[in-house]
Amino acid sequence: METLQHLDNLRLSGKIRHIGLSNETAWGTSRWLTTARTHNLPQMVSIQNEYSLLCRLFDLDMAELSHHENIGLLSYSPLAAGLLSGKYADGTTPTGTRRSINADLGGRINEHLWPALNGYLDIAERH
């Protein structure tokens, strides 16, 4: 509640217009909304979570919550840390890329990735 009170003070002073969350779950978001409503504080209007063809966690429960609570998605990593750009096709790792620093790109690379990724890249190339 203290965080929401501080955010409300920032809103009332004109320093921010709205508030949102990042990397939050549906349960966590619903708790923020309940606290805001209970104490007449500003409600979250956006959620910034990862979302791409390879990361669809938002679709499991956040999409429903976002729809019913009018919370917009500000997706990040829409190209899945560069995987969907094709620069890592066939397992290559160009010098100076994220993958040259973090080999599995934060857990995105696993044995199931390459068949799906190659399928997406094939479709993209044909269209």
Stretches found by the model and what they are:
Residues 1-127:
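Beta/alpha (TIM)-barrel catalytic core signal, keyed to glycine-rich beta->alpha loops juxtaposed to Asp/Glu
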